[in-house]
Curated annotation (Swiss-Prot):
Organism in which the protein naturally occurs: Legionella pneumophila subsp. pneumophila (strain Philadelphia 1 / ATCC 33152 / DSM 7513)
UniProtKB keywords: Cytoplasm, Flavoprotein, FMN, Isomerase, Isoprene biosynthesis, Magnesium, Metal-binding, NADP
Name of this protein: Isopentenyl-diphosphate delta-isomerase
InterPro entries: Aldolase_TIM (IPR013785), FMN-dep_DH (IPR000262), IPdP_isomerase (IPR011179)
This protein's encoding gene: fni
Functional note: Involved in the biosynthesis of isoprenoids. Catalyzes the 1,3-allylic rearrangement of the homoallylic substrate isopentenyl (IPP) to its allylic isomer, dimethylallyl diphosphate (DMAPP).
Amino acid sequence: MQNEYSQFEQRKRDHIELALMPANQSSELNPFDHFSLVHEALPDLDFKDISIQSIRFKKPVEKPFIISSMTAGHSNALEINYRLMEACSKTKWAMGVGSQRRELTDKQAAFEWTPLRRDFPMVSLFSNLGIAQLIDTPISAIQRLIDTLQAEALIIHCNPLQECIQPEGTTNFQGCWTALEALVKKIASPVIIKETGCGFSKNTLLRLNNIGVAAVEISGVGGTHWGRIEGHRANKDPIRQRTADTFRNWGIDTLQSTRNAISLNPSFEIWGSGGVRNGLDAAKLFALGATTVGFAKPMLEAALGSTGQVLTQMNTIEYELKTAMFCTGSRVLDDLKEKACP
């Protein structure tokens, strides 16, 4: 078991290093540059009156941003997550934690969150578990993950391509829909479904809407591509390496995935993420109808430096969003919906 934990920690460290490599970014497929907002030369408003307030789980929130789930369960995670949570405590951003899978078998792993929650009790956090683990995990154990974190909601992440290419991948997803539907019915916390860089089809989103999930985090193609990352890790497995190269552009991009969701007029909230690198990208997602926007790689890069760098990144994104709103004559986020170029 100890050897398994050592391998787990090494895999998580690999993920951090590889996630920052340009080769593992599907930025050449990023759609944001091909989507524009209508410029307003005479915006009849005062910049200081612009509001970026949004709604999350039917309640108003001051900031419409989250740090998308990244890393947990290894020795380097504590410092990274401390900086991220410290910054969130100052900006009122929310945060999805990395996978809590290890906590299911290692009781000590849960103590990672004790000092973080002690120092930052007011930060809105979301628990996180993979769909493959959900299938075989009792609801009571999942509830413990939420309780340990004092989480506002639970993220279930879906990563079929990553699991196929990861040397240690879990590729048995049979029963995932049944398990997900049971979870939504039995657990009190809001359930968020998140992809990990490959986006969502309209049919999948329709099924998610029918079972009553609270939110879908799009995480489409255009940002960090986990198929590419696992291909780099599978350097002793030529079959997985070649497969990673074949599927290097696999998935549905963030804007198309968001449009797929909007077209359904769903009951779930649409959270835009996947290749979002600045506040202008965020503005475009709000214009399409997202109510929350998530950032991962930009925050990870900053958190490897300092809390100050994370705060600078957050403040810049907020200012860029407000600049996009001012230059389109949008006083509130909903106004952006009328400013998308046809």
